């Protein structure tokens, strides 16, 4: 996305930003495309969503009353009408391309025209703290399965099956990898720098997590300790349970980081421990918003101590 803006303008922008802007950690620009055929119900639906790091900032939906690229972050509302016109034209062109691809894939897989099928695509770039490219990527899937992907060298394609081999042969002839590489190494980085500058109050902030530990008795007689991290941004965080200072990564249950709905994230990690040994276990929380890692233990209240004693007596009587 963004390829229609004058490249000279983007290069000037990158030259201005690069010497003065540095950021903690890496940042990413990613686009997710989904095209779904629906025989008998009209043309395929096409949705494009863009993310800077973990923040959705643009969206296009062909099923909208007036399909247009629209802002999904307040800082994107500063973009002028020319930007939205250009991006809408790009999206409409992509929509037409996916219609053709859906028809081609029917023939590649010898499928009938009566069923619904889905193409998914993810592409983008990551930059380091100095604004230089760390990596670029482009991946395609068909009906939920890997189809074709750009290798790390950004020069060759990895294919999943014979149908994807047909696509690779076409793309090798028309220079698709070279175009993707030029976009990922140049335009993608330039637009990411622009978006980071545009939304720096939101995108470059560091909200530290609030952490605490809860205890949950189990029928087996032991207990689960769950370490919570809430209200943090960006999403990258590390939770590690330790026993007497030794990591317990093999014994932990760890959920994926989840959006909290208010622009921050939440996550938890749990471990099963013997009843009465809770104080030997520590949860270590690492996040860029913290000046140093947090160490959290379960802190029982007086009422909790009484409840655990009753639980122990009940289990002892049962045994």
From Swiss-Prot:
A GO molecular-function annotation: peptide antigen binding
Ranges of residues in domain Ig-like C1-type: 209-295
Q: Where in the cell is it found?
A: Membrane
For the keyword rRNA processing, the answer is no
Q: What start and end residues bound the annotated signal peptide?
A: 1-24
- Role summary: Involved in the presentation of foreign antigens to the immune system.
Quaternary context: Heterodimer of an alpha chain and a beta chain (beta-2-microglobulin).
- Name under which the protein is recorded: Class I histocompatibility antigen, Non-RT1.A alpha-1 chain
UniProt gene name: RT1-Aw2
